[in-house]
Regions:
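Bacterial Sec-dependent N-terminal signal peptides
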Residues: 1-27
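A generic hydrophobic-helix recognition signal that picks specific residues
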Residues: 3-5, 34, 107
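N-terminal pre-domain segments of enzymes
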Residues: 22-48
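Aromatic-lined, polymer-binding surfaces characteristic
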Residues: 37, 44, 48-53, 58-66, ...
């Protein structure tokens, strides 16, 4: 159920933002300096915000996102499974869960402006960045974790020092 909600949220949010003009490569230095850069721009984010209250499905998805972000506030950061299970190198499930957490927490912060979501996302990012590695032998573990960190860093914008 979580995955389908997340996928639905993405498709809905970004379907409202796609126009021919937005498909052009952005070359303006000013636009590239603003956050977010990954998956949507600040202008596209504003268009989504403008639709709140006018689209019941979007409002429902936003409520689901905020509820899940609230739940994640109480969830401890994930541990590196290689510390507890000998002879395992796989952290793919941890990497995928980290993408899920970053999307939820960082988007909740962007849509609500509530610092607690950004603070929790920052703790999560620092925690996974302190893993000894992200299992470089298995490229997908690294790719998923890199995606999580990139989205978190970008969507939290100027939150970091």
């Amino acid at each position: 159920m979580r995955l389908i909600n997340l996928v639905g949220l993405f498709f809905l949010l970004f379907s409202f933002t796609m126009t021919g003009r937005n498909l052009l490569v952005r070359q303006s230095g000013k636009e590239l300096r603003q956050h977010p850069r990954l998956l949507f721009s600040k202008q596209e984010e504003q268009r989504i915000r403008d639709l709140f209250g006018t689209e019941p499905l979007l409002d429902s998805l936003r409520a689901s996102l905020m509820k899940e972000a609230e739940r994640l506030l109480a969830v401890p950061p994930q541990e590196d499974p290689r510390r507890k299970i000998k002879n395992t190198k796989d952290i793919l499930s941890v990497s995928r869960e980290q993408v899920y957490r970053m999307v939820n927490l960082a988007l909740a912060y962007r849509l609500s402006g509530e610092r607690r979501f950004a603070e929790k996302a920052e703790k999560e990012l620092v925690h996974v960045c302190n893993f000894s590695d992200w299992d470089p032998i298995h490229y997908l573990d690294v790719a998923e974790m890199t995606t999580a960190v990139a989205i978190g860093y970008d969507w939290l914008g100027g939150w970091f020092g």
